[in-house]
Amino acid sequence: MKKDIHPAYVETQVTCTCGATFTTRSTATSGTIHADVCSQCHPFYTGKQKILDTGGRVARFEARYAKKAAADAKK
């Protein structure tokens, strides 16, 4: 095997947006990683359901097809 071709594998502190931190090993040169979700705040692991911002999409869908239904009713 060739020597000195692999990146340094160092201890890395992972910080989640919920505030949880844990240490792992990574090739990240800064030694820190910022994660959006972790096992302490992800709904799959916590069993809690988070409400996603789908209300806007549903409202747009209903408005679009309400217009189509109204146009079909006029015909």
UniProtKB/Swiss-Prot annotation:
Positions that bind Zn(2+): 16, 18, 38, 41
Job of this protein: Binds the 23S rRNA.
Protein name in UniProt: Large ribosomal subunit protein bL31
Disulfide bonds: none
UniProt entry keywords in alphabetical sequence: Metal-binding, Ribonucleoprotein, Ribosomal protein, RNA-binding, rRNA-binding, Zinc
Annotated cofactor note: Binds 1 zinc ion per subunit.
Cofactor: Zn(2+)
Stated family: Belongs to the bacterial ribosomal protein bL31 family. Type A subfamily.
Subunit structure as annotated in this protein's UniProt entry: Part of the 50S ribosomal subunit.
Pfam families: Ribosomal_L31 (PF01197)
Keyword rRNA-binding attached: yes
